[in-house]
Amino acid sequence: MLGWIKRLIRMVFQQVGVSMQSVLWSRKPYGSSRSIVRKIGTNLSLIQCPRVQFQINSHATEWSPSHPGEDAVASFADVGWVAKEEGECSARLRTEVRSRPPLQDDLLFFEKAPSRQISLPDFSQEEPQLKTPALANEEALQKICALENELAALRAQIAKIVTQQEQQNLTAGDLDSTTFGTIPPHPLPPPPPPPPPPLGLHQSISAVDLIKERREKRANAGKTLVKNSPKKPEMPNMLEILKDMNSVKLRSVKRSEQDVKPKPVDATDPAALIAEALKKKFAYRYRSDSQDEVEKGVPKSESEATSERVLFGPHMLKPTGKMKALIENVSDS
C-alpha cells in the first residue's frame, strides 16, 4: 500500500515537473519553491478570476439626465438599489432597468446633509438664563461695601488696642513713682476706652497718628537715656595712630664707650653658660670668619668689636665639607 502511494506521488510530481529530491531535501525559506503547493500553483496554467470593481457616484449625478444610463460599471449605489427591490426574485443591476424620474422626496433626502440623531437630552435648553450685567454690578458693590465695613471695624479695634497700651504704660509709670510713698488703699479702676470715631477714614487716620506718636516718644526716650548715661571711654583706633608713621624721623644717639664694652658675665647666668657652650662647639666657624677678615685687611679693632658684638650666627655651624665640594664644582665648571 505504501509503495503504491509513493508511486502515485512520484507520478504527480513528474507531471507537474518537480523532482522528489528537490521537494524533500530543499529547505529554501522563501520564493516560489518554498512549499509544494506553491510549486504546483506556479506550474499549473490557471486563469485568474476577474476582480470586482466598484465606482462611487455622487447623489447629485445619480439622477441627473446627463448621466449615461448604459454605464456597465457597478458601484456602491447599486447595492442600495438592490436592497430596495424586495419584490423581485432575482437581483439586477441598475443599468438593466429603465431609469425612472426622481421624486421630490428623494431629492429632499439627498439634498439634506446626513445628521446624527442624539438620544441624550439637551441640557443647554434647561440651563437658566444668564444674569444681567446690572445684577452682577449690584452684587459686586454689595461685596465691596461689606469689605469696607470689615476694614473699618478692624481699624477701630486697632485704635482701641493702641490707646489701652498707652494708658497701661502711663499707669505703670505712675505706680513706679509712687512706690516710695504711701500705698493707696484701693487701686483706681482703669478709665473706659474712648468711643470709636464715626467714620472709617477718621479711624484710620487716628490709628496711624497714634503709631507715629509712639515711635517719636520711643526715639526721644532713647536719646535722653543716651545723653544722661555716662560716656564710655572709646577704644583707640590703630589706623589713626599708625597714620603718621611714615612722617616720623628717628634721631641718632651716640653711645659712650662704657655702653659699647661688654658687661661682665655672671657665672650663674644660664644664658651665659649656653653661649659659652655654643662658642666652644662652633669655634671652628668663628676662626674661619676671623681668618677671612684678616685676608680682607680689616683692622684688628673692628674685627675684635664685631667678634665681641656677634655672639650667635652662621659661624657657629659645624663644617661638613659639602660647601667646599660645591665651590670646587662651580669653579671647575
Curated annotation (Swiss-Prot):
Pfam families: Mito_fiss_reg
Stretches for region Disordered: 286-315
Compositionally biased region (Basic and acidic residues): 286-307
Localization of this protein: Mitochondrion
Single GO cellular component term: mitochondrion
Sorted UniProt keywords: Mitochondrion, Phosphoprotein, Transit peptide
PTM annotation (Phosphoserine): residues: 119
Keyword RNA-binding part of the UniProt annotation: no
GO BP, one annotated term: mitochondrion organization
Family under the similarity heading: Belongs to the MTFR1 family.
Job description of the protein: May play a role in mitochondrial aerobic respiration. May also regulate mitochondrial organization and fission.
Protein name in the entry: Mitochondrial fission regulator 1
Native source organism of the sequence: Pongo abelii
Originating gene: MTFR1
